Amino acid sequence: MSAILKATNINKIYDEGAVSTQVLTGLDLTVTAGERIAIVGTSGSGKSTLLHLLGGLDTPTSGEVWLHGQLLNSMNETERGAMRNKHLGFIYQFHHLLAEFTAIENVAMPLLMRPEVSTAEARQQAIDILNSVGLEHRLAHRPGELSGGERQRVAIARALVTKPSLILADEPTGNLDYDNAQSVFGLLSELQSTMQTALLMVTHDRNLAALADRQLLLRNGHWENY
């Protein structure tokens, strides 16, 4: 199966004055279509940094990140943004929804960045995906009017509305209680399977990681045996 995402020899060093800190060292990773991968590690292990690099939100100090056969490192920010919008969906521990916009407006936003998609089309697609996550009765509600579990369902809908080939999820259930976490991850897994979208998930929860096809352990910036 062909690779959606391929990272080779990824290194990330942060310089603060005379002090250099190596956060990631020599990491390789390949993600194929429809695959579900969990990256496990404690706080400070470099998980979120790696996810940002893989999503083109930051660039590695050295190494290469390829998305659908195109080298993200060689692109400017506008080009990387277009690649993200076309191929990737993002879900965070904290939903990152815009407080002044309704659920429909938040979910439609990635589609409205595409000049070929009309406002009416974006709105209808947002309604359809919100219905699929069980929020047909909360379409006009703003984030402050939704529960934690509902906000994360809106975030999932926003990540999936563009029909991405890969979802990058950073602790997607980390801010929820156990019951909501199980419900939200079950929904995400179901939609991911139905849409044949790959999922790369960062988590410290080994029980959640066990539900993935493959588990990777990141410790002090290195891969270790899981």
From Swiss-Prot:
Q: Where is the ABC transporter domain?
A: 5-226
Would you tell me the Gene Ontology cellular component terms? plasma membrane
Q: Which organism is it from?
A: Psychrobacter cryohalolentis (strain ATCC BAA-1226 / DSM 17306 / VKM B-2378 / K5)
Q: Indicate the quaternary assembly.
A: The complex is composed of two ATP-binding proteins (LolD) and two transmembrane proteins (LolC and LolE).
Q: What is its EC number?
A: 7.6.2.-
Role according to the record: Part of the ABC transporter complex LolCDE involved in the translocation of mature outer membrane-directed lipoproteins, from the inner membrane to the periplasmic chaperone, LolA. Responsible for the formation of the LolA-lipoprotein complex in an ATP-dependent manner.
Q: Which residues bind ATP?
A: G41, T42, S43, G44, S45, G46, K47, S48
Cell compartment(s), UniProt = Cell inner membrane
A GO molecular-function descriptor: ATP binding
Q: Which GO terms describe its biological process?
A: lipoprotein localization to outer membrane; protein localization to outer membrane
Give the bilayer topology: Peripheral membrane protein
Please name the PANTHER family in this protein's record.
Answer: IMPORT ATP-BINDING PROTEIN (PTHR24220), LIPOPROTEIN-RELEASING SYSTEM ATP-BINDING PROTEIN LOLD (PTHR24220:SF689)
Q: Which InterPro entries has this protein been placed in?
A: AAA+_ATPase, ABC_transporter-like_ATP-bd, ABC_transporter-like_CS, ABC_transpr_LolD-like, LolD_lipo_ATP-bd, MacB-like_ATP-bd, P-loop_NTPase
Q: What is the annotated signal peptide range for this record? A: none
Q: Which PROSITE patterns match?
A: ABC_TRANSPORTER_1 (PS00211), ABC_TRANSPORTER_2 (PS50893), LOLD (PS51244)
Q: Key word Hydrolase present in the record?
A: no
Family named by the database record: Belongs to the ABC transporter superfamily. Lipoprotein translocase (TC 3.A.1.125) family.
Sorted alphabetically, which keywords does the UniProt record give?
Answer: ATP-binding, Cell inner membrane, Cell membrane, Membrane, Nucleotide-binding, Translocase, Transport
Query: Chief location of this protein?
Result: membrane
Q: What is this protein called?
A: Lipoprotein-releasing system ATP-binding protein LolD
Name of the top EC class for this enzyme: translocase
